[in-house]
């Protein structure tokens, strides 16, 4: 269905949404002007998460009424049969946000009925950074078009790994350790940022947590792919809905998956 969508126009609209989100989230972050609650899954949420998602949803309904919405805080809105769905994470990295760490972003993606991401924006105003992509248009940041690295050997690669208890539960922790030992250098940049660093060619592969949701992955998936990289789940499937995310420059993807697969 993507041939019936004006991708450039929808990308412009997604960038407009990101502008709204940045204006809503950045000042309270610096002022530390928000309260923190806890969800049932023991993750933090602020009133800014909820208010930002509501702001973006209202703007989408105002200007893209036929489209559906799926967001972290309020779930689905609009017709389930809608040909296009906006997938939103108002603040990816809420834990960082609440602690004054500037590594957080608003993630916005538009996907079609075949679950193909068409446009994506990852906006991290506290990092003074934004990344965006349109299907078939490439991926960009403020400096221009971005592209993944050309590193082809794992022992020359910089990787980022996000570990938590779910990796223990599937017996994968030692595999992550092995990946880090075999890489030239390992860091833990976390959340969206590690994948954007892959897209920019600054690092060469990133392995995320297990238990991710589509609002964590839809936008980063398209940005990485349009930058020439590869996005899969931890088992190698291409869907962004499978609860995990591995990104790379493509050359290293099989090597990474062969080590961490469990």
Label the model's feature ranges.
Residues 25-28, 49, 60, 94, ...:
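Residue-level signal for inorganic ion chemistry
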Residues 147-262:
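An extended, acidic
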């Amino acid at each position: 269905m993507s041939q019936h969508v004006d991708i450039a126009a929808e990308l412009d609209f997604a960038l407009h949404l990101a502008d709204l989100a940045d204006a809503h989230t950045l000042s309270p972050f610096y002022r530390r002007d928000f309260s923190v609650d806890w969800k049932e899954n023991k993750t933090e949420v602020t009133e800014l998460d909820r208010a930002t998602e509501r702001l973006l949803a209202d703007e989408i309904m105002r200007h893209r009424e036929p489209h559906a919405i799926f967001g972290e805080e309020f779930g689905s809105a609009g017709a389930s049969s809608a040909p296009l769905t906006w997938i939103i994470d108002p603040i990816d990295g809420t834990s960082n946000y609440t602690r004054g760490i500037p590594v957080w972003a608003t993630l916005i993606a538009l996907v079609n009925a075949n679950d193909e991401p068409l446009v994506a924006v990852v906006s991290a105003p506290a990092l003074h950074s934004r990344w965006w992509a349109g299907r078939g248009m490439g991926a960009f940041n403020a400096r221009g078009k971005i592209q993944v690295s050309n590193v082809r050997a794992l022992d020359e690669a910089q990787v980022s790994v996000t570990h938590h208890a779910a990796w223990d539960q599937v017996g994968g922790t030692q595999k992550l350790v092995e990946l880090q030992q075999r890489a030239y250098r390992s860091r833990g940049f976390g959340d969206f940022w590690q994948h954007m660093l892959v897209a920019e060619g600054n690092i060469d592969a990133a392995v995320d947590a297990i238990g991710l949701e589509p609002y964590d992955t839809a936008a980063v998936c398209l940005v990485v792919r349009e930058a020439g990289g590869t996005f899969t789940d931890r088992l190698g499937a291409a869907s962004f809905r499978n609860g995990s995310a591995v990104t790379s420059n493509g050359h290293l993807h099989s090597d990474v998956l062969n080590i961490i697969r469990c």
